[in-house]
Amino acid sequence: THERSSAASDVYKRQALIRDKNFFNWLELNSENLALFEKNEMKQMIRRCAELHMHQISNGGDPFEMGSARPLDFGHWSAHKLESMTNYRLRHGEAVAIGIALDARYSVLAGMLDKGLEERICCLLEYLGFKLWNVAIEKTNKDDGLELIKGLKDFQEHLGGELTITLLKNIGVGFEVNEIDISIVQESIQWLKERQK
C-alpha cells in the first residue's frame, strides 16, 4: 500500500492541484474509497490523470520538459532533497506529499493562494494516508542552516541553471516563479511542524 499511496500523491499534485479544480473536488468527495483503493474510483482517477497528462503532452509546448518550466514537478524541490537526506527511506510519493504541503503553505504566505486552502490540501493528503512531517526537515548543516534549503540549489541545477518553481494561485491553477524567499520557506516549515502537534 505504500507504493500505491506514493503513486496517489503524484496523481494528486500533478493533475488536480495544478490543473483541475473539479478533479480535486472529486478526489475530496471520493477520498474514503480512494484511501481504500476501491477499484471503480481508482479506475476513474487513473483515467482522468491520463487525460490530463495527454493534454499536457500535446498542448503544453514542452512535452519532454526540456526547458526550465516543469509544472509536473510541483512539490519536488524539497521532495528530492528529503529523499536523499533520508537515504531514500522516505519514498518519492511520501516526500512529494511533504513538498506539496510546504509549497501550498508558501503560496499562502507569499499572498498567492487564499488562506485555508493549504489546510484543505493537507487534510486530503493526510486522509489518503500521508504523513506531512519528517524529522529530516529540521536537519541542519555545518553552517547551522537548514539542509533542506540546499534543495533549491540542487533543483536549480537539475533544471539546467534557471530556478523555476511551480506554486499555486488556486486549487487547479499552478504558475511558475523564478525566485523563492528563504524566510517564507522557513515559516512554511515551522507551520508544518506546528500542525503535526
What are these regions (language model features)?
Residues 25-145:
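Active-site segments that bind and position negatively charged phosphate/pyrophosphate groups
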Residues 22, 29, 67, 166, ...:
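Residue-level signal for pocket-adjacent positions within structured domains
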Residues 14-15, 105, 109, 157, ...:
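Amphipathic alpha-helical interaction elements
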Residues 8, 68, 160-162:
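A structure-centric signal for secondary-structure junctions around beta-strands
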Residues 1-8, 12:
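Single conserved hydrophobic/aromatic residue that forms the stacking wall/gate
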Residues 112-197:
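C-terminal charged capping/lid subdomain of soluble metabolic enzymes
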